[in-house]
């Protein structure tokens, strides 16, 4: 079964019939569920901390939220990587798109699925907590919009670079088995680094769900522009400067395992 992921270095729009291909539909459903799993646990950890403590701006609270994000993303990537590639993030999908690893048609379907998954998870979280309003993301005092854009771009560059190295690179070898942990742990580390400044979004879907359900839109554009810039640059750098030209057209890890591999 093909997931429709293409060799790199060739931007492709894709065919209209790709949107209704069973493999594409399965991949989009996988992205929806994986993103919902991630956002529910990630935003839930923030709500839980706020429920227990009046002041969440403590070092212990930051570590707890970072760990929750790391574990949630690791699981979300693991459950989706053999079906859709385990993007779980519109910025990661964009990085794969500019590197020629997914078609535009598939990318658009992934984006829709990821955003819907994030909204569904946040709605379920609000219902399950008796109507608690998701806090979402905000810039700390003294942090300007463009400072946050730069921070988001740098953090998401690292996230996308790690994804390329452990999931997409044709020569990733056995390192591919730790891809979910590698990506998850880096996300957690970035939450520790950037959380006190802008919440450390790195994922437009992760930010969009709470923004819509909690109706908090201030500085929202920052959490789209920064991650897309960082992920797009990482995709170009890894695709053109790291992967040898001879390996660029080699199919990669977004193929499901054969039954005997389970």
UniProtKB/Swiss-Prot annotation:
Membrane topology: Multi-pass membrane protein
UniProt-annotated location(s): Vacuole membrane
CC terms in the record's Gene Ontology section: membrane; protein storage vacuole membrane
Gene Ontology BP terms: water transport
Keywords: Membrane, Repeat, Transmembrane, Transmembrane helix, Transport, Vacuole
Motif (NPA 1): 89-91
Entry-linked CDD domains: MIP
SUPFAM superfamilies assigned: Aquaporin-like
Any GO MF annotation of the entry: water channel activity
Motif (NPA 2): 203-205
Keyword set includes Transmembrane helix: yes
Membrane-spanning ranges: 27-47, 61-81, 104-124, 148-168, 175-195, 223-243
Classification via Gene3D superfamilies: Glycerol uptake facilitator protein (1.20.1080.10)
Family named by the database record: Belongs to the MIP/aquaporin (TC 1.A.8) family. TIP (TC 1.A.8.10) subfamily.
Domain-level remarks: Aquaporins contain two tandem repeats each containing three membrane-spanning domains and a pore-forming loop with the signature motif Asn-Pro-Ala (NPA).
Function: Aquaporins facilitate the transport of water and small neutral solutes across cell membranes.
NCBIfam families, alphabetized: MIP (TIGR00861)
Name of the protein in its database record: Aquaporin TIP3-1
Organism: Zea mays
């Amino acid at each position: 079964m093909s997931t429709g992921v293409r060799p790199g270095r060739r931007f492709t729009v894709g065919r209209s019939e790709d949107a209704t291909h069973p493999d594409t539909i399965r991949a989009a459903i996988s992205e929806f569920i994986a993103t919902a799993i991630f956002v529910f646990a990630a935003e839930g950890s923030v709500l839980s901390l706020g429920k227990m403590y009046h002041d969440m701006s403590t070092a212990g609270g930051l570590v707890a939220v970072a760990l929750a994000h790391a574990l949630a993303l690791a699981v979300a990537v693991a459950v989706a990587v053999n079906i859709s590639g385990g993007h779980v993030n519109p910025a990661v999908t964009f990085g794969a798109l500019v590197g020629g690893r997914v078609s535009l048609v598939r990318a658009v379907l992934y984006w829709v699925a990821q955003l819907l998954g994030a909204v569904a998870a946040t709605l379920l979280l609000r219902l399950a907590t008796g109507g608690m309003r998701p806090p979402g993301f905000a810039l700390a005092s003294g942090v300007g919009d463009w400072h946050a854009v730069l921070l988001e771009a740098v953090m998401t560059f690292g996230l996308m670079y790690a994804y390329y190295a452990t999931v997409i690179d044709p020569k990733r070898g056995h390192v591919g088995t730790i891809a979910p942990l590698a990506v998850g742990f880096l996300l957690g580390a970035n939450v520790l680094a950037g959380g006190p400044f802008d919440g450390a979004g790195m994922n437009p879907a992760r930010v969009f769900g709470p923004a819509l359900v909690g109706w908090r839109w201030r500085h929202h554009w920052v959490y789209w522009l920064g991650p897309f810039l960082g992920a797009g640059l990482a995709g170009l750098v890894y695709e053109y400067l790291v992967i040898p030209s001879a390996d660029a057209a080699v199919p990669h890890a977004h193929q499901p395992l054969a039954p005997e591999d389970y």
